[in-house]
Structures are given as structure tokens and as C-alpha cells.
């Protein structure tokens, strides 16, 4: 930035970092600076649309998305980037919808297919999620995220599944025998407590996976092992 303060990729990275830290006003300020340099930068408009969605400003989000698609109406990058940012804010259903739109624009857009696979797995739509992960891996066997996910999928096949009280609890056979029933009882108690506290009902089975190693949890959550700190 000291060499070229108008470098858009560097500015956009700063905007993303500020958004990740929930410094939305600062992120918006950086985006305004970008639009003064390049008012048609699609990826920046995608981030702008995502930030408006996070702040519950649907009309502004729609307008920002339209600006990102102004000169390429079917650019899959725009919806992919919007959805990716929304998913990073735990808005997985909204993020998945944008990935589906990106794939409608370009059915072979692997970034969207990989992200959609992860979103669906987080939403409990496992059959489609694992299928998309396999499709993405077949298209790019060197992609780290899908390789890690499918390796974990093979491990999960060896787990014991306890299906009771609206929960699907997956854990290793040894741990399931040791405290599986107690875990289901605790989950049931927690659901009743928080359903009453927040006056809501959880629809569909809740999938809970207990991993013996932290790296497996990291792969399931982030697509890559790690997570120290």
C-alpha cells in the first residue's frame, strides 16, 4: 500500500479483514475508496452486498449486487463472494442460496460448488452436500478442502450413530458405548431449556458429531485441519 495506495486488491483485502472483525463502518469506508478508483469492481460490490445483508438492509444489498453484475449479468463470482461472506457470518441458508445462483450462472464454477457443499453439510442436508463435495473433488483432485472433507467422510462411516429424541449423534463406537446415552439426555435437556428461553422450536433432526481429534473437527468446520490458538 505504501507503493500504491490505490491498489484495489489490497484495499479489498483490508475491507474483508475489517468485515471479519465486525468493523463494518470501517469496511464500508474502504469500499467507498475502492469505488472511487473503480466503480465497477465486481468483487467489491459483492462484499458491499454481503455487508448490507448482514446489517439487515435488503434493498441496499439488492442494489449492490446489481451493481456488481452491471457489465456481466451472469458473473458467478458475485454471488459466490456474497454467499461466502454470509456463510462466514453463520448465515448458511442465505449463503447457500447465493452459491446456487452462482451455479445457475455457471454450473462448473467449482468455488461455488465447494462452498455450497460445505454450507449444506452445516445445514444438515448431508446427502446433497457430500455429493457436491465428491463432484468438486472429481473436477479438481488437488483441492485441499474437498480432499479433507471426503477423507473425513470415510472416517465418519465407521462412527456409531445414535438416533433419538430428534438428535442424530455420531461418535466413535468406544465413546458411544461409554457415554452416548448420557450425551443424548444432555442434548435433550439443553434443547428444552433454550427452546423455552428463546420461544422457538428447532425443526428437523439436529446432527451432533463428536470427534476424538481436534483436526477432524477443524476439517468439518473449516475444511482444513488446525484451529490452534
Summary of predicted features, one role per range:
Residues 20-33, 54-67, 89-101, 123-132:
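Structural signature of tandem alpha-helical TPR/SEL1-like repeats
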Residues 1-2, 32-36, 66-70, 100-104, ...:
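Conserved structural position within tetratricopeptide repeats
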Residues 5, 39, 73, 107, ...:
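Short coil turns that delineate tetratricopeptide repeat
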Residues 2, 64, 70, 158-229:
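Juxtacatalytic substrate-recognition/specificity segment
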Amino acid at each position: 500500500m505504501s507503493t500504491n495506495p490505490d491498489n484495489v486488491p489490497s484495499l479489498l483485502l483490508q475491507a474483508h479483514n475489517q468485515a471479519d472483525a465486525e468493523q463494518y463502518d470501517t469496511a464500508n469506508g474502504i469500499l467507498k475508496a475502492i469505488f472511487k478508483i473503480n466503480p465497477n469492481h465486481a468483487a467489491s460490490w459483492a462484499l458491499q452486498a454481503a455487508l448490507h445483508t448482514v446489517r439487515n438492509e435488503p434493498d441496499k444489498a439488492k442494489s449492490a449486487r446489481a451493481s456488481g453484475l452491471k457489465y456481466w449479468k451472469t458473473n458467478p463470482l458475485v454471488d459466490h463472494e456474497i454467499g461466502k461472506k454470509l456463510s462466514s457470518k453463520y448465515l448458511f441458508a442465505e449463503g447457500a442460496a447465493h452459491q446456487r445462483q452462482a451455479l445457475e450462472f455457471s454450473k462448473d464454477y467449482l468455488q461455488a460448488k465447494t462452498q455450497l457443499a460445505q454450507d449444506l453439510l452445516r445445514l444438515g442436508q448431508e446427502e446433497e452436500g457430500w455429493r457436491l463435495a465428491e463432484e468438486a473433488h472429481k473436477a479438481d483432485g488437488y483441492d485441499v478442502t474437498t480432499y479433507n472433507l471426503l477423507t473425513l467422510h470415510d472416517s465418519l462411516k465407521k462412527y456409531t450413530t445414535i438416533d433419538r429424541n430428534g438428535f442424530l449423534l455420531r461418535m466413535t463406537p468406544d465413546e458411544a458405548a461409554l457415554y452416548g446415552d448420557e450425551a443424548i439426555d444432555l442434548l435433550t435437556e439443553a434443547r428444552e431449556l433454550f427452546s423455552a428461553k428463546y420461544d422457538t422450536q428447532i425443526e428437523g433432526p439436529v446432527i451432533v458429531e463428536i470427534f476424538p481429534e481436534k483436526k477432524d473437527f477443524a476439517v468439518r468446520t473449516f475444511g482444513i485441519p488446525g484451529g490452534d490458538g
